[in-house]
Swiss-Prot record:
It is a single-pass membrane protein. Keywords: ATP synthesis, Cell inner membrane, Cell membrane, CF(0), Hydrogen ion transport, Ion transport, Membrane, Transmembrane, Transmembrane helix, Transport. This is ATP synthase subunit b. One of its GO terms (cellular component) is proton-transporting ATP synthase complex. Pfam families: ATP-synt_B. It comes from the Bacteria.
Length: 156
């Protein structure tokens, strides 16, 4: 193997090329790789933050869902209580109305009984007068014997 001038020239050219690349090309490649590494790291960080945010949002949504269910249960319970209260009030009102109607009917019955008694007293008094007229054969003066008729009516 002969080392000639061509091999030395190629070696010098290769060394010059390496020095040129190290001075001008290599720093730009390193800067681009560092920038890309930085962007990848930021992307991974953002993904981690997004995962944490998602987990936090899921916890918050679960908490809100639980609160909403509790509120719905409370509202349903209150509605049931109010419904039962309305039913009880309606029952009480119906009982009171029934008692009022019963009392009114009882008063009406008593009034009609009293009226019937008065009518019967009047009829009995008239029959007594007619019977007395027939027995005595004379007309009995109702005005003269009104006290007697009143006593008789009161006794009946």
């Amino acid at each position: 193997m002969n080392i000639n001038l061509t091999l030395i020239g190629q070696s010098l050219t290769f060394i010059a090329f390496i020095l040129f690349c190290m001075k001008y090309v290599w720093p730009q490649l390193i800067a681009m790789m560092e920038e890309r590494e930085k962007r990848i790291a930021e992307g991974l960080e953002a993904a981690d933050r997004a995962d944490k945010d998602l987990e936090l949002a899921q916890k918050k949504a679960g908490k809100q869902l639980t609160e909403a269910k509790e509120q719905a249960a409370t509202i349903v319970e209150q509605a049931n209580k109010r419904g039962n209260q309305i039913v009880e009030e309606a029952k009480e009102a119906a009982v009171a109305e029934g008692e009022r109607i019963k009392a009114a009917a009882q008063a009406e019955i008593e009034r009609q009984v009293a009226q019937a008694r008065e009518e019967l007293r009047g009829k009995v008094a008239a029959l007594a007068i007619q019977g007395a007229e027939k027995v005595l054969g004379t007309t009995v003066d109702a005005k003269a014997h009104s006290e007697m008729l009143d006593k008789l009516a009161a006794e009946l």
